Amino acid sequence: MDNLGESPTDKGGEPGESEETRATPGALVAADTEGIPEETDRDGDADLKEAAAEESELKSQDVSDVTAAERENSSLLTPAAKKLKLDIKDKKEKKQKVDEDEIQKMQILVSSFSEEQLNRYEMYRRSAFPKAAIKRLIQSITGTSVSQNVVIAMSGISKVFVGEVVEEALDVCEKWGETPPLQPKHMREAVRRLKSKGQIPNSKHKKITFF
């Protein structure tokens, strides 16, 4: 009887315990499975943050290394670079100063011109030899084709040469007590004087004999 009385309670207790014991592993597994993703997410975020921090540190270190290398290179090249910059600056300043002086001198000279001299200057400044004629002349003498730069240079030299001959011819005309316009005799005398001064090369071929 005692055994029969105890058995229901024992049997009742055993099923309760078995249900609890059966339920608790599932609950534990569920709790574990629910907790694992949160921990992995947190760990992943921490890893990403650490990786980003390390990458930023590496970048900052690389930048500092590059800037240090640039500073070292600049310190090594500083004297030569400074000298080159100073030379270029001095040349620019000198050229600018020379240009300003030339402009000022030209302005003073032009302001002192008479009306006739001013007209002559304007005509000379605007005058130019036709480049096609200069090119044909050069090609007929040399027998070869020339570039446009050579034609421009020869045109400018020819203009300067003719200007010098005309100026010398005007001096001859004045010394002879004559008035312009210039005549062929004035031009011939001007060429003769320029040749005697060595300003015009002698076009006649002279045979040099050796003893």
Swiss-Prot record:
An individual GO BP term: positive regulation of transcription initiation by RNA polymerase II
Subcellular location: Nucleus
Biased composition (Basic and acidic residues): 8-22, 43-73
Region listing for Disordered, in residue ranges: 1-74
A cellular component annotation (GO) from this entry: nucleus
Keywords: Acetylation, Nucleus, Transcription, Transcription regulation
GO MF annotation, one: DNA binding
Domain of life according to the entry: Eukaryota
Homology family: Belongs to the TAF11 family.
Protein name: Transcription initiation factor TFIID subunit 11
